[in-house]
Curated annotation (Swiss-Prot):
Protein encoded by which gene: ftsZ1
Family membership noted in the UniProt record: Belongs to the FtsZ family.
Biased composition (Low complexity): 534-546
Protein's name in the database: Cell division protein FtsZ 1
Main location group: cytoplasm
Subunit structure: Homodimer. Polymerizes to form a dynamic ring structure in a strictly GTP-dependent manner. Interacts directly with several other division proteins.
Cited InterPro entries: Cell_div_FtsZ, Cell_div_FtsZ_C, Cell_div_FtsZ_CS, FtsZ/CetZ, FtsZ_C, Tub_FtsZ_C, Tubulin/FtsZ-like_C, Tubulin/FtsZ_2-layer-sand-dom
Pfam families: FtsZ_C, Tubulin
Region named Disordered: 346-372, 524-590
Keyword Secreted (UniProt): no
One GO location term (cellular component): cell division site
Length: 590
């Protein structure tokens, strides 16, 4: 019986770091890092330009936007680069499988790097991968439009990465001279990315007295915002201090400073001659630049190739975190503070004004409020006036017995003052038709009442006495004694002479009738003259009274009197005489 013994497969557990180059600038950075011999890192290049992919040194490439760009590039349009990345998002995720840390590098200002880099970074971050962005900004001679596109791309990328490092190409002039070639200048910019990645990989892979694991690196770089990377080398006396100063003052970074950094990763590498005092001197100098409460992680490793040299690498994160939090709080506080102050102040003065004007008149409030709100709507105003006329008719009748007159009720009584005179000589049945034509008169008064309630209150208070005097006249009805003296004389004449005249008619002869008729004429003439003399003073006093046109129209008619107050029965008595005297006797008398 054979026994098969096999060696168990041991899965090597180590952090996997991927450098993802996007666009032309990212592909060039990857080529420079591969040429420098960076070990322990996987390289992936993605681009929309098929020709650029043929010149890359990376083994894993992604042709983005085959259907969108057909391999011709994005044409400096970030929208095209974004669409190309979204088209092959599944392939991007496959290349990120099993990655623990991803460096997304690109050149901002173009089409593919500016548009596709945020998509790649967001895909990596969604998988829980620690994502670090390292991008470059264009030169000033490339134009303002390209710079604005780059700034917008950096703003979008910062939302998708944990830590972002920005390297302006314009800063290359600080370290370049007239002999520096164009390719060498870009290689210097790529050295920043190379030193940062090498710093992290050396701490986790190479042998050393103070080794670091990937969890330490993740705690320093997770969601830290803007960051800076720097590396310095020195030899001879004071090499530790010189290397630390060179690492702190990196001339290629985007005007950043380590002041106030929340996370700090320090890597000190040297040969076997590295001393304890040199490590302390370098670490102390770097620690002075950051926040006292910053999370500082220090690692020291040995490299046989660095005999007589010391290399100090620094990764400072959370540089703008404190400033951003303070600015965000202040920005949130400023717009919110004035809002609750402005709204109550604008609403407080508007509320007491309508309440004060409406409190003294509780009943007409529903009538006044629609007039103020519907001044422009003439149709609604006419409807409201018709409703007011109906209410005024009811209010005029109900306010006769009201104990305490108010400003608005007085306005209604004043409007009906010319109508109150008509009740002196007109029956109650005639009051209704008289009030209807007089109602349009108070319309302008009612329209002005809600606009200026205070100005109308003064004349209204002077009217109550006049209204009471005018309403007292209808109580006294006309009697017989109020008739003119001419009418009284006529009434007396009808009562007294009638029986005497009837007594003489029966047995009277023809001659007596003639004489009696002549005497009757003389008596009537004397009576009329006496009545005229008696009625003269009374008629004069009657004419002195100011009679209104309404009273003259509705005064009792004098159907039996003429314009001079003479009695109409004279004509009747004369006619009676003409009827009583025969025709032949009338001829004889003539």
């Amino acid at each position: 019986m054979a026994i098969n013994l096999q060696k168990p497969d041991i899965t090597e557990l180590k952090p996997r770091i991927t450098v993802f180059g996007v666009g032309g600038g990212g592909g060039n950075a990857v080529n420079n890092m591969i040429t420098a011999g960076l070990q322990g890192v996987d390289f992936v290049v993605a681009n929309t330009d098929a020709q650029a992919l043929t010149m890359t040194k990376a083994e894993r490439i992604i042709q983005m936007g085959v259907a969108v760009t057909e391999g011709l590039g994005a044409g400096s349009q970030p929208e095209v680069g974004r669409a190309a990345a979204e088209e092959c998002i599944d392939e991007i995720i496959d290349h990120l499988q099993g990655t623990h840390m991803c460096f997304v590098t690109a050149g901002m200002g173009g089409g593919t790097g500016t548009g596709a880099a945020p998509i790649v970074a967001q895909a990596a971050r969604n998988k829980g991968i620690l994502t670090v962005g390292v991008v470059t900004k264009p030169f000033h001679f490339e134009g303002g439009r390209r710079m604005r596109i780059a700034d917008q791309g950096i703003s979008d990328l910062q939302k998708s990465v944990d830590t972002l490092i920005v390297i302006p190409n314009q800063n290359l002039f600080r370290i370049a001279n007239d002999k520096t070639t164009f390719a060498d200048a870009f290689a210097m910019a790529d050295q920043v990315l190379y030193s940062g990645v090498a710093c992290i990989t050396d701490l986790m892979v190479k042998e050393g007295l103070i080794n670091l694991d990937f969890a330490d690196v993740r705690s320093v770089m997770r969601e830290m915002g803007r960051a800076m990377m720097g590396t310095g080398e020195a030899s001879g006396e004071g090499r530790a201090m010189a290397a630390a100063e060179a690492a702190i003052a990196n001339p290629l970074l985007d005007e950043t400073s380590m002041k106030g950094a929340q996370g700090l990763l320090i890597s000190i590498t040297g040969g076997r001659d590295l001393t304890l005092f040199e490590v302390d001197e370098a670490a102390t100098r770097i620690r002075e630049e950051v926040d006292p409460d910053a999370n500082i992680i220090l690692g020291a490793t040995f490299d046989e190739e660095l005999e007589g040299l010391i290399r100090v690498s620094v990764v400072a994160t959370g540089i703008d975190r404190t400033a951003a939090e303070v600015a965000g709080r202040s920005a949130d506080f400023r717009p919110v503070a004035p809002k609750p102050i402005v709204r109550p102040s604008a609403a407080v003065p508007a509320q007491p004004q309508p309440t004060v004007s409406l409190q003294p008149v509780p009943q007409p409030q529903p009538v006044q409020q629609p007039l103020q709100q519907q001044n422009v709507d003439h149709i609604a105003l006419a409807i409201r006036e018709a409703e007011m006329e109906r209410e005024l008719d009811i209010a005029a009748r109900a306010q006769v017995a009201a104990p305490a007159p108010q400003p608005q009720p007085h306005l209604q009584e004043e409007a009906f003052r010319p109508q109150s005179k008509l009740f002196a000589g007109v029956a109650p049945t005639e009051a209704a038709p008289v009030m209807r034509p007089a109602q349009p008169a108070p319309r302008p008064v009612e329209m002005q009442a809600p606009v200026q309630p205070q100005m109308q209150a003064q004349p209204v208070q002077q009217e109550p006495t006049q209204v009471v005097r005018q309403q007292a006249e209808p109580v006294r009805m006309p009697k017989v004694e109020d008739f003119p003296p001419v009418v009284k004389a006529e009434m007396d004449y009808r009562t007294q002479p009638a029986p005497a005249h009837q007594e003489e008619r029966g047995p009277m002869g023809l001659l007596n009738r003639i004489t009696s008729s002549l005497g009757l004429r003389e008596r009537e003439a004397t009576n009329v003259s006496s009545d005229m003399t008696a009625a003269a003073p009374s008629a004069a006093s009657q004419q002195r009274r100011p009679l209104s046109p309404e009273a003259s129209l509705y005064a009792p008619r004098r159907g039996q009197l003429d314009d001079h107050g003479r009695a109409a029965p004279q004509m009747r008595s004369h006619e009676d005489d003409q009827l009583e005297i025969p025709a032949f006797l009338r001829r004889q008398s003539s």
